[in-house]
Amino acid sequence: MKSPHVLVFLCLLVALVTGNLVQFGVMIEKMTGKSALQYNDYGCYCGIGGSHWPVDQTDWCCHAHDCCYGRLEKLGCEPKLEKYLFSVSERGIFCAGRTTCQRLTCECDKRAALCFRRNLGTYNRKYAHYPNKLCTGPTPPC
C-alpha cells in the first residue's frame, strides 16, 4: 500500500496537469503504455480530420472519438480547447471539470483511451503516418 504522502503527491500532480491535448495524451499513455504520438496521424481518423473507412479497430476508436467531439461541438462545446481534470487508478479513469463541457470532453477522451487499450492487438505500425490518399471506402456515419 502506498503511503498517504505519495497518494497526496500523486493527486496534486494530476490536478496540476490541465489542457485537453496534454490530458488526452496522458490518458493514452497510462492506458496503453504507448506514447500518444504513436496514435497521432494513425490510419484514416487518428489526428486531425478523418474520412473513408477506418483501417482497423484502433482507427475505429479514433472515428468514435471524432464523432464524440462532433456531438459536443453541436452542444456549443469546444472539446479541442476544453481543460479538465482527471485521475487514473486501478479502478479506471475518473473525470472532473468545472463545466459540463469540460466533463463531457474528458468522457470522450476517456472512452477513446479505453478503446485503444481494448484494441492494442490491432495497432499496426504500417498505419502510423498513414497517407490520407490510401484511405478508401465510404465514410461511416457516427
Curated annotation (Swiss-Prot):
InterPro entries: PLipase_A2 (IPR001211), PLipase_A2_dom (IPR016090), PLipase_A2_dom_sf (IPR036444), PLipase_A2_His_AS (IPR033113). Changing N132 to A/K: Significantly decreases the catalytic efficiency. The active site is at H65, D109. Restricted to the brain, heart, lung, and placenta. Its EC number is 3.1.1.4. Its cofactor is Ca(2+). Its main location: secreted. Ca(2+) 1 binds at Y45, G47, G49, D66. This is Group IIE secretory phospholipase A2. The gene is PLA2G2E.
